[in-house]
């Protein structure tokens, strides 16, 4: 058996629809497009969401909410990821050098997910209750 001898199982692939090949085919002349109108023309289609000039649903519904500017510069770091940071003191700069957060992040919160085995000092980061308990149980401490 070679790659050039492989073929699909008989009957598994339907034959292509050959349009414009006479009346007997069932798809002759207008090729299944009907008569006249925008959708019968080549390239004739309306964009998704267009409702024929009626005000589209997307514009009929009210706007709501906003994106907080602070959320764009805030990140969460899991407890398990702190093990990747070299050194005993963990702050914003060390998280950036360890590639755990991007350079535009200004606020970080440490959340309880995973576990930490070594002693670390978390400096200037917000920490959840569960993460704080886990860090202190491992012999670490939190500094504001």
UniProtKB/Swiss-Prot annotation:
One matching Pfam family: Ribosomal_L27A
Top-level taxonomic group: Bacteria
Keywords attached to this entry: Ribonucleoprotein, Ribosomal protein, RNA-binding, rRNA-binding
Comp. bias intervals (Gly residues): 21-31
Transmembrane is among the record's keywords: no
KW Hydrolase (keyword) present: no
GO terms under biological process: translation
One GO MF term: structural constituent of ribosome
Cellular component GO terms held in the UniProt record: cytosolic large ribosomal subunit
InterPro entries associated with the record: Ribosomal_uL15 (IPR030878), Ribosomal_uL15/eL18 (IPR021131), Ribosomal_uL15/eL18_sf (IPR036227), Ribosomal_uL15_bac-type (IPR005749), Ribosomal_uL15_CS (IPR001196)
Region of interest (Disordered), residue spans: 1-57
Family (UniProt): Belongs to the universal ribosomal protein uL15 family.
Stated role: Binds to the 23S rRNA.
NCBIfam families: rplO_bact (TIGR01071)
Record's subunit section: Part of the 50S ribosomal subunit.
Record protein name field: Large ribosomal subunit protein uL15
Organism name: Photobacterium profundum (strain SS9)
Organism classification: Bacteria, Pseudomonadati, Pseudomonadota, Gammaproteobacteria, Vibrionales
């Amino acid at each position: 058996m070679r790659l050039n001898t492989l073929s699909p199982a008989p009957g598994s692939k339907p034959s292509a629809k050959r349009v414009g090949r006479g009346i007997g085919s069932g798809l002759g002349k207008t090729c299944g497009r009907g008569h006249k109108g925008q959708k019968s023309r080549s390239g004739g289609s309306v964009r998704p969401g267009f409702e024929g000039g009626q005000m589209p649903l997307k514009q009929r519904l009210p706007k709501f909410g906003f994106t907080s500017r602070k959320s764009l510069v805030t990140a969460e770091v899991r407890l398990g990821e702190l093990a990747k940071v070299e050194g005993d003191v963990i702050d914003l700069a060390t998280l950036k050098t360890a590639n755990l957060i991007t350079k535009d992040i200004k606020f970080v919160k440490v959340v309880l997910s995973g576990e930490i085995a070594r002693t670390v000092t978390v400096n200037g980061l917000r920490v959840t209750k569960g993460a704080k308990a886990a860090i202190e149980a491992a012999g670490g401490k939190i500094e504001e």
